């Protein structure tokens, strides 16, 4: 699935507010909607994955730099049993950007109680102009007659990124290396799962797929046409999704939204929990 911002374009047109093209105009749009009693942005922050993906998505540009990839390689190393915390190069800035985003969108403790139905209900009723969600939401609302588009994360450095999450992940038993027959069977299953036919079958109607297999052509529905350039620039961030990241993101980001932690305190708290 592909995540970013689901946007009610008709609301923008109704109130003559320009669609966002960068972070500054995104913030301006949020402020303009607030003046007419509409939430510019919200999301279902009762869920751990929304907390986690917002934190990472806002810093996708920085997390994919050389330093960011270096940290991620160390954190995700399957051969290492040592606990790895956050680095002191890339991650402090990620919490600064999260804190800035919270201020700019006026997120509060009330948003922590919002679930998916709450947020989509606000969007459907014209009470919220934008929310964090998947491109499937665009189809859902268009089918309901709401002029909806999909926009990327607007990084504060000017870049645009989208968040991707795997449909499935595969682990192969190391013992297969010693059993040729079983290994061949496992690879046959793997090849089928990664084939174009199989990937198109597992994709739900209206949902886009960005395949990591080079032999599967790019498939974008009309709902992603506004971020095609982002895809073509390969600005597709694959989320870090360890069990620790889910749990710690929920705890720390929730406290940031509630105003209980500064960016520095959040960085320290997150790091401490990863190392615990």
Region spans (language model):
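Paired acidic/hydrophobic, glycine-rich loop segments that form the ligand-binding mouth/hinge
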Residues: 129-134, 149
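Glycine-centered hinge/linker elements that transmit conformational signals in sensory
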Residues: 30-32, 73-112
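Extracytoplasmic/periplasmic substrate-recognition and gating elements
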Residues: 15, 142-205
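Conserved C-terminal helix/tail region of periplasmic/extracytoplasmic solute-binding proteins
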Residues: 13, 199-200, 228-276
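Short helix-initiation/N-cap motifs at beta->coil->alpha
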Residues: 23-28, 109-124
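A structural signal for short loop-to-beta-strand junctions that line the ligand-binding cleft
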Residues: 1-10, 39-40, 154-163, 232-240
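A local structural motif
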Residues: 14-19, 99-114, 127, 144-147
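Periplasmic solute-binding protein
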Residues: 1-27, 38, 45-77, 164-174, ...
């Amino acid at each position: 699935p592909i995540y970013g911002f689901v946007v009610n374009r008709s609301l923008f047109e109704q109130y003559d507010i320009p669609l966002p093209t960068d972070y500054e105009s995104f913030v301006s749009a949020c402020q303009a909607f607030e003046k007419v009693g509409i939430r510019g942005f919200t999301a279902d922050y009762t869920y751990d994955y929304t907390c986690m993906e917002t934190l990472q998505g806002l810093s996708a540009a920085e997390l994919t730099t050389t330093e960011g990839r270096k940290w991620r390689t160390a954190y995700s190393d399957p051969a290492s049993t040592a606990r790895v915390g956050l680095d002191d190069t890339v991650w402090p800035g990620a919490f600064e950007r999260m804190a800035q985003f919270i201020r700019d969108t006026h997120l509060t403790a009330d948003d922590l109680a919002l679930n998916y139905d709450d947020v989509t209900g606000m969007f459907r009723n014209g009470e919220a102009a934008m929310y964090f969600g998947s491109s499937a939401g665009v189809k859902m609302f268009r089918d309901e007659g709401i002029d909806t588009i999909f926009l990327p994360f607007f990084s504060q450095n000017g870049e645009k990124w989208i968040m991707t999450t795997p449909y499935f992940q595969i682990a192969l038993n190391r013992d297969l290396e010693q059993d040729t027959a079983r290994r061949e069977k496992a690879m046959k299953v793997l090849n089928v799962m990664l084939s174009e036919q199989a990937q198109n079958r597992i994709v739900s109607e209206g949902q886009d797929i960005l395949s990591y297999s080079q032999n599967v052509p790019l498939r974008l529905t009309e709902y992603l046409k506004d971020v095609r350039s982002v895809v073509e620039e390969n600005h597709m961030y694959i989320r870090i999704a360890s069990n620790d990241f889910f749990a710690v993101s929920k705890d720390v980001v929730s406290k940031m939204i509630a105003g209980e932690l500064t960016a520095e305190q959040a960085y320290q708290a997150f790091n401490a929990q990863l190392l615990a």
